[in-house]
């Protein structure tokens, strides 16, 4: 139903029953008629439906919550006390790009995930400077299929970690686990086989939900897991094991590992941890900027931008004074 349709039904009932709303009774000791009860129920439905439509329009398609006091803010998990206990509070996701210790670009979003903030930040960088950065180094919160495809389409190198990067590179036991699908043997006919030499057959291919570039996953099922001596280590159910594989994403992860494990990648990672994280540390702890005081995403962007400008001016003056003293 839509509010207009329900309003038409209410109008038809008023004409059919010849209702006069001025004769309706309210309060204790008054008995409402059947017609009045039906009329009030329908009008309540119309009001609630209109309210829900308005809330959905405010929320938009890219988030599932908003604050009543600031419709642009989204509820996020935030560490608020010295014990690290997090609470669900309205907040914004502030993104900065740092180059040579200066804040080069600032962006504010109401997305809860950093993965959704990468592309807007890169577009904002290009809008400001006329080109995309060649080596955007980021932590594991930014490495996704969408962001990697965006980098390929715009000539950007992939230097963003993916969520399992640390486990892939630091945990040798996990990396060489023979029961992981990526470590299964491929025979001469191109068939994937598990450690028990059982073949995995292709079932179907499905689209990954919420992916704008049409990412697809292939599902394979083992031909027979009955009596397998590795069943306890290999699978968690009584059925034949199924695996999901995306060769394109797997190759992207391997490329990211090669980039970040190189000497150039190690230097970039070191600089990112010093400059980007250090900049946030200076803003929060040295400048005591821990809470946004304005409301509305446009006002918040202006506030954060002014803080970034102040940081850059302070950094420039300090460098200038150090160079003058050294000379």
What are these regions (language model features)?
Residues 1-327:
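Anion-binding and metal-coordination hotspots
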